[in-house]
């Protein structure tokens, strides 16, 4: 197995930085769309281990990447807890029965009763792991991000229902977050047992919070998960809070091994705020892949020259968020090939 991706977490000198791409198995690839068309709804596809494996392999077959990520969705946990999840075209994920009260919280299944309903995810991990020669990344949404959809009922620009609960009924908010954190620990450990070599916690909506609320309602539970997972496994764990660069100083002493960095902060700023103890992952703007081949190469050159000058060995090349569905796959190859021309 190629171990460059895992070697980055050892803080040893590497000849070149590892590469993978958030949402690398996704709608921008025609072969993904062909597989997706065979399923009436998205979750049916997620429950098919062979389909999950096939789409996870597509980017590895096209590009020289150093890791795969299991094909799944962050909302598998709320659905396993008994919530009614539907993916509506043009809207996205929708829960018809959002959490509004303690009564709603009490109707959710326990962690122990929920994990069995997630066996299809572990099957996807096992099937994919057997088919690849690179490390496999398992993942979850952060409790705060899962709660955002569970309370709001869908995605939102303001998440006013979620934030109202946080301020008006913090006890209920914490009770929900703790329930989610407990099941997430089991969920991630099961992914490790099935073959995941690294784990990532996607805190997609942590960036909407003020600092003190971020520490209390988001980071606290990510840290709880990482601590408990690492007590029973030795796989690296990466935190990624979208729009969270203002919170980087809070991560210095946390249990994560790496930090995802978006494009709103430079790598040197991120390193200064986080310190040398964490691997940095990122931070190309996904939109730069809309550019010409020359502009893509020039952007790569600027970033990689910084990495060379800083001897930034604990660094993983990635986008600052998921790749957009209308990106030209050929431009991804230009990016990957340009990165491969550089050594640390």
Swiss-Prot record:
<dbReference type="GO" id="GO:0006782">
    <property type="term" value="P:protoporphyrinogen IX biosynthetic process"/>
</dbReference>
<feature type="binding site">
    <location>
        <begin position="23"/>
        <end position="27"/>
    </location>
    <ligand>
        <name>substrate</name>
    </ligand>
</feature>
<keyword id="KW-0627">Porphyrin biosynthesis</keyword>
<feature type="site" description="Transition state stabilizer">
    <location>
        <position position="73"/>
    </location>
</feature>
<keyword id="KW-0456">Lyase</keyword>
<dbReference type="InterPro" id="IPR006361">
    <property type="entry name" value="Uroporphyrinogen_deCO2ase_HemE"/>
</dbReference>
<feature type="binding site">
    <location>
        <position position="204"/>
    </location>
    <ligand>
        <name>substrate</name>
    </ligand>
</feature>
<keyword id="KW-0210">Decarboxylase</keyword>
<comment type="function">
    <text>Catalyzes the decarboxylation of four acetate groups of uroporphyrinogen-III to yield coproporphyrinogen-III.</text>
</comment>
<dbReference type="InterPro" id="IPR038071">
    <property type="entry name" value="UROD/MetE-like_sf"/>
</dbReference>
<protein>
    <recommendedName>
        <fullName>Uroporphyrinogen decarboxylase</fullName>
        <ecNumber>4.1.1.37</ecNumber>
    </recommendedName>
</protein>
<dbReference type="GO" id="GO:0004853">
    <property type="term" value="F:uroporphyrinogen decarboxylase activity"/>
</dbReference>
<keyword id="KW-0963">Cytoplasm</keyword>
<feature type="binding site">
    <location>
        <position position="73"/>
    </location>
    <ligand>
        <name>substrate</name>
    </ligand>
</feature>
<dbReference type="GO" id="GO:0005829">
    <property type="term" value="C:cytosol"/>
</dbReference>
<dbReference type="Pfam" id="PF01208">
    <property type="entry name" value="URO-D"/>
</dbReference>
<feature type="binding site">
    <location>
        <position position="321"/>
    </location>
    <ligand>
        <name>substrate</name>
    </ligand>
</feature>
<dbReference type="InterPro" id="IPR000257">
    <property type="entry name" value="Uroporphyrinogen_deCOase"/>
</dbReference>
<comment type="similarity">
    <text>Belongs to the uroporphyrinogen decarboxylase family.</text>
</comment>
<comment type="pathway">
    <text>Porphyrin-containing compound metabolism; protoporphyrin-IX biosynthesis; coproporphyrinogen-III from 5-aminolevulinate: step 4/4.</text>
</comment>
<feature type="binding site">
    <location>
        <position position="149"/>
    </location>
    <ligand>
        <name>substrate</name>
    </ligand>
</feature>
<comment type="subunit">
    <text>Homodimer.</text>
</comment>
